[in-house]
Amino acid sequence: MLVSDFHFDLPDELIARYPTEERTASRLLHLNGETGHFEDKQFFDLLDQINEGDLLIFNNTRVIPARLYGRKASGGKLEILVERVLDEHRCLAHVRASKAPKEGAELVLGEDKLGEGNGFKAIMTARHDALFELHFNEEQPLFDLLQQAGHMPLPPYIDRPDEDADQERYQTVYSKVLGAVAAPTAGLHFDNPTLEKLKAKGVNIAFVTLHVGAGTFQPVRVDNILDHKMHAEYAEVSQAVVDQILATKATGKRVIAVGTTSVRSIESAAQAAEKEGKLITPFFSDTSIFLYPGKTFRIVDALVTNFHLPESTLIMLVSAFAGYRNTMKAYQHAVEAKYRFFSYGDAMFINKNPNALNDLP
């Protein structure tokens, strides 16, 4: 199975660089995975697709202002993107600079927001492949420093500086647990009134946590997808969520994941449970689960997701869920119908294809 099997041509003008004025004002492409039929709708029509007793699972991770600008104490500008906070004073980060800092190098960060001479210092203590371990020599916890001096880490394809409005719009309204460096974007379409309408309809709601890493934007750099090494992200699926999933399955209702990160969290927990002969168990660990055509989904029955990059692991996940041909036809239609793509773009609602295992490139 080749990466090129998941290519499609995307005009640059279809990349959404700003969100819609209202969260629910996006368009929605409904793809029935079983029949392959798709239909153009508006996002607020999603309410008609979700039934009483269904379980809607969201990812409640909260994006940290993870991008910092600064300089080496010895001179030379640099840009830092925090990938993972290790504790109150240490993190792993990507560093962009004309010359990579060496171990022991002192960095001065945040002066663009705090003023010249008011930045804070960090020491590069170790390198782990592409990531640098940084130690911040400040009394304040790292999360506080990022809130003061960090920028929202907009994805590279948005291709503009972050603005004040992104502080709100690049977060879901239910985000709670700090730790992501990218938003779980399917959730950006939901506002509080929509959540209240779902509850009033008798739809059950649950939250998992997966801290989305910058690896989600990394291109697949191999020809055969089986050679791809998936990045790891930390995920949590609590006992309470497991109980809700089991109760939903017992009544014959659907488990609906909001976003690929929710899918990966739930299916990671199911994969771990399989070794114990169970359907699903609580999960608190890193996951590098890679779902591509030929892989099975043990729990998730339907999916809300945005439109993803060509040749990305996310379009591979959608193809595994909806069927390869269904997915590529739906994407071709989305391009022709001028849907808006990627993080600030439009959404899909997909019913699982029970025959997806047989629909390979």
From Swiss-Prot:
Any GO molecular function: S-adenosylmethionine:tRNA ribosyltransferase-isomerase activity
Pathway(s) it belongs to: tRNA modification; tRNA-queuosine biosynthesis
Pfam family, one: Queuosine_synth
GO process terms (BP): queuosine biosynthetic process; tRNA wobble guanine modification
Subcellular location field: Cytoplasm
GO cellular component terms given for this protein: cytoplasm
Keyword field contains Transferase: yes
Classification via SUPFAM superfamilies: QueA-like
Keywords assigned: Cytoplasm, Queuosine biosynthesis, S-adenosyl-L-methionine, Transferase
InterPro entries in the record: QueA (IPR003699), QueA_dom1 (IPR042118), QueA_dom2 (IPR042119), QueA_sf (IPR036100)
Catalytic activity as recorded in UniProt: 7-aminomethyl-7-carbaguanosine(34) in tRNA + S-adenosyl-L-methionine = epoxyqueuosine(34) in tRNA + adenine + L-methionine + 2 H(+)
Enzyme Commission designation: 2.4.99.17
Enzymatic class: transferase
UniProt keyword Membrane, yes or no: no
Main location: cytoplasm
Quaternary structure, from the entry: Monomer.
Family, as annotated: Belongs to the QueA family.
Function summary: Transfers and isomerizes the ribose moiety from AdoMet to the 7-aminomethyl group of 7-deazaguanine (preQ1-tRNA) to give epoxyqueuosine (oQ-tRNA).
HAMAP family: QueA
The protein's name in its UniProt record: S-adenosylmethionine:tRNA ribosyltransferase-isomerase
